Regions:
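Short, well-ordered secondary-structure micro-motifs within conserved domains or adaptor modules
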Residues: 2, 18, 24-78, 87
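Accessory, often N-terminal, substrate/partner-engagement and coupling regions
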Residues: 76-102
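Flexible, glycine- and charge-enriched loops at secondary-structure boundaries
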Residues: 81, 193-201, 233, 237
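N-terminal [4Fe-4S]-dependent radical SAM core
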Residues: 99-102, 122-169, 218-219
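Canonical Radical SAM [4Fe-4S] cluster-binding loop centered on the CxxxCxxC motif
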Residues: 166-199
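Conserved SAM/AdoMet-binding glycine-rich loop
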Residues: 205-289
């Protein structure tokens, strides 16, 4: 799909919307010609108190246009979020006008839709208000909205169970062997970034050392440990052992109630890696289909 952006450079938001609504398409940033039948022109005009987004879209010759006005307040960080939400909503509505269909999760992309109802309920909204917000503002189906709110309630209950001096740790491994067909992320596979893997691991170990010193100085304990990605099992068994050995040496893992590593795709897992995980006390793994 040819994409033309006017008045902004929010490529990520537009590409996420394209992948969500038109999963077979890939972004091409070139001028739109009269012979092209699959394209989107996303325009933004921003003022002090709001913005106007217009999306003109053609998919296989069927065209639709949607225009959306959205208020904008707050600091630049807050305005950036509102701007991206407006672009995402407008693109979704234009695409819906072309296809006549909507994914169960509506305009939401990525892997953390539960953050929205969790944030709302933490601020005082009822579960019903959070559910209605997902359906009204993000076009999520009633079934998925109910699922998200149920998960948000479980998340808030888990947060309430944390003691004041406890923290949860996420260790990110942002590499994948190849791109999965179901993945909505705009990313590169490890074949193109393999040279960065070892330097990244070196830097990660330095950061873990620094974190260990902070936890020791502040007297905080570690409640949960989760290694995700990407695909952590893109690392070799030797690299995994090196990483988890350092974690054991400098982090207070003995108090963890959950020690999880996202094993990712079955083709990245072998016996040697599983033995490394088990040997370091990992009690839970997740495997993608």
């Amino acid at each position: 799909m040819k994409l033309v952006l006017k008045g902004h450079d929010e490529r990520y938001v537009v590409e996420q919307g394209m992948l969500n609504l038109f999963p077979g398409e890939r972004p091409v940033y070139e001028p739109i010609g009269p012979e092209d039948d699959t394209w989107a022109r996303v325009s933004l005009r921003e003022e002090a108190d709001g913005c106007t987004v217009e999306v003109e879209l053609s998919w296989r010759g069927t065209a639709a246009t949607h225009r959306l006005d959205a208020p904008m307040t707050g600091d630049e960080f807050q305005r950036e979020g509102l701007r991206r939400r407006a672009i995402g909503r407008c693109f979704f509505l234009a695409a819906h006008g072309v296809t006549g269909t909507a994914p169960p999760w509506g305009m939401l992309t990525g892997v953390r839709p539960v953050k929205l109802p969790t944030r709302e309920m933490a601020a005082g909204a009822t579960p019903e208000q959070a559910r209605s917000s997902l359906e009204r503002d993000c076009y999520v189906s009633p079934e998925r909205a109910e699922l998200a709110v149920d998960c948000a309630q479980a998340s808030l209950a888990a947060l309430r169970s944390l003691a004041p001096g406890e923290v949860s740790l996420y260790v990110g491994i942002p590499f994948c062997p190849t791109r999965c067909a179901y993945c909505s992320f705009v990313s590169a596979d490890v074949g193109r970034t393999l040279k960065l893997l070892e330097p990244y691991l070196d830097a990660l170990l330095e950061e873990i050392d620094a974190l260990g010193r902070i936890l020791e100085r502040t007297g905080k304990g570690l409640r949960t440990f989760y290694m995700g990605g990407g695909t952590p099992t893109t690392l070799s068994a030797v690299q995994l052992d090196r990483l988890l050995t350092r974690c054991r040496e400098v982090l207070p893992l003995e108090g963890c109630t959950e020690y999880t590593v996202e094993a990712g795709r079955p083709d990245t897992i072998d016996r040697a890696k599983l033995e490394v995980l088990k040997g370091h006390g990992v009690g839970r793994i997740s495997i993608n289909p």
